[in-house]
Amino acid sequence: MGIGVAVATWVCAKLDDMKTVTDETFFAEVPLFSEFEGVTDAANYRPLPDGWVLALADIVGSTPAIAAGRYKDVNMAGASVISAVLNSVGKGDYPFVFGGDGALIALPGSLEKAARDALAAVQVWVEEDLGLTLRIAIVPVADTRAEGLDVRVARYSASPYVTYAMFWGGGTSWAERQMKLGRYGIDRAAPGTRPDLTGLSCRWSPIDARHGEVVSIIAVPGEGRPGQEFRDLVNGIVSITTEQNRDSHPVPADGPNLAFSLHGINREAKATAPAGRRLRQKLIIFLQLAITVVCYKLGIPLGRFDARRYKRDVAGNSDFRKFDDGLKMTIDVDAEHLKRIETLLEAARAKGIARYGLHRQASALMTCFVPTPISRDHMHFIDGAAGGYAVAASRMTGKVLATAPHQT
């Protein structure tokens, strides 16, 4: 009897070990696709493992902040969620999506406690340092499946160095709705609690449109789950964007101009250093920028850091288009191509195939997560500079947000 119990215990332990390895390597083992049209191919998606959770956050009542031109702060709050959670779990390779005024990260259940603590900490930081209110939640994937939905993930290769998660199945949208209803909440952290925001950066100035306007677009299925007609809509929009240079990418191929935002540098210093060390952090940032500019102008690397290569990688590693139970993209598009996109969207809306929101602005914003500038896997989150996805979403739901002024 004792031997049988021992054997059973050993087998269970081995199975637990195997499960841990599977959880840790799950996303890395999802097959890559490199043509964005693949977001509509169900064969590219894999269901999240049982026992996983969704860590979610978004800004509550972003209207006043957008009207005041503080969308860079809103974007930074959204990106800080990704930075805080990934740093709390050792920067593992887990699926996430940036939504402009919020974010979602999928994690194994074994990391739920770390994610809860990180979300609670970033909520306090956003409130105390940015003056914004962040709503947070942890939703079990099993609960989405109990509703007849699913959370399936695909892995899109934006460049040879960075992949981004695409989500399909209705589960993430359901989880977001539950969060906004006040369910699956997380206890508040103590005042003064600070998350680990190492790598969070927002130094770049807004990136002006070169072809016409920077347009943020959201399109989601009209009723029920997306069918072939919705897939055709997404493919049609993507096809139009590919007719322009670099698929209507809002960031130039050789990277953004070497223009930096003083306001953004101040934000970054507040995010990555405690109150007593922020002046020192600003000086470090200015020194890093000076070195980057000199190395770029002279075309010489500094050790393993190559400024010209880094700037090109910024463009290649940017997430200007994504799929999260619907299409989201921020593109640089001319009037003729935009008109064709709007025609497709309006026809789909009239037929009940899709709901959509669209917002035009003069430039794009970029908020970054750079674990180390030496490595080439730095990530850059793109949104419109004057309200972006938040304003597009408001137009989809029928709410009215004030037009945001140009932000620096």
PLM region spans:
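Regulatory and interdomain segments flanking nucleotide-handling catalytic cores
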Residues: 2-408
